[in-house]
Amino acid sequence: MYAFSYSTPRTLDEVSAAS
């Protein structure tokens, strides 16, 4: 999950949207 955050999104909000 954290690996994806470093892939593109920077904030938790972006991570949620990317998921």
Swiss-Prot record:
User: So which cofactors does this thing need?
Assistant: FAD
Q: Does the keyword Magnesium apply?
A: no
EC number(s): the record gives: 1.2.5.2
Reaction(s) catalysed by this chain's protein:
an aldehyde + a quinone + H2O = a quinol + a carboxylate + H(+)
Which UniProt key words apply to this protein?
FAD, Flavoprotein, Oxidoreductase
Q: Which domain of life is it from?
A: Bacteria
Molecular function in Gene Ontology: aldehyde dehydrogenase (quinone) activity
Class of the enzyme per the UniProt entry, highest EC level? oxidoreductase
The note on cofactor binding and number reads: Binds 1 FAD per subunit.
Subunit composition and interactions? Heterotrimer composed of an alpha, a beta and a gamma chain.
| The name this protein goes by in its record | Aldehyde dehydrogenase beta chain
Q: Which organism is it from?
A: Comamonas testosteroni (Pseudomonas testosteroni)
